[in-house]
């Protein structure tokens, strides 16, 4: 396993995930009968700071359809948690309009690179262009100064 599992931390994430799903109206328990489901949910709500109990609750009561999605969410969160420890693996998100993202993705595919690599290449291209324009402007100014002196 690439990322170490931290039981207490992940138990808290699972508790938050389940509570959030419950508040969004999803069925988080395996029970069809609403009173049994509500008893199980009430139990869960009381065990926020008891990681072992949360894990036992999950084993006993979780909706099987939700279990895999929760595992995927926790796996992604674990990855983000460990990646955030190092500057070179830390990720940030940006909002792009769909058409901008589409053009960027197409360019990345043509260049056979990731979106991040493509953005870095575009920035470097723009910086080189700016530097070239500054050099040309400076040369033009120097040339005018030389010709003006004569």
Swiss-Prot record:
One of its GO terms (cellular component) is cytoplasm. InterPro entries: Arc_rbn_hlx_hlx, MatP, MatP_C, MatP_N, MatP_N_sf. Keywords: Cell cycle, Cell division, Cytoplasm, DNA-binding. GO terms for biological process: cell division; regulation of DNA-templated transcription. The keyword DNA-binding applies. It comes from the Bacteria. GO terms for molecular function: sequence-specific DNA binding. Its main location: cytoplasm. It is found in: Cytoplasm. Belongs to the MatP family. Homodimer. Required for spatial organization of the terminus region of the chromosome (Ter macrodomain) during the cell cycle. Prevents early segregation of duplicated Ter macrodomains during cell division. Binds specifically to matS, which is a 13 bp signature motif repeated within the Ter macrodomain. This is Macrodomain Ter protein.
């Amino acid at each position: 396993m690439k990322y170490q599992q931290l039981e207490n931390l992940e138990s808290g994430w699972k508790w938050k995930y389940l509570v959030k799903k419950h508040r969004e109206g999803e069925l988080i328990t395996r029970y069809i009968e609403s009173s049994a489901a509500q008893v199980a949910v009430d139990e869960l709500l009381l065990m926020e700071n008891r990681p072992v109990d949360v894990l036992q609750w999950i084993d006993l009561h979780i909706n099987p359809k939700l279990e895999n999605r929760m595992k995927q969410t926790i796996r992604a969160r674990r990855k983000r948690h460990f990646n955030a420890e190092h500057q070179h693996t830390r990720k940030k998100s940006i909002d792009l309009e769909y058409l901008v993202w589409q053009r960027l993705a197409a360019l990345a595919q043509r260049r056979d690179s990731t979106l991040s690599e493509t953005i870095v290449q575009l920035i470097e291209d723009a910086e080189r262009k700016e530097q070239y324009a500054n050099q040309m402007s400076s040369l033009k100014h120097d040339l005018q100064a030389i010709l003006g002196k004569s």
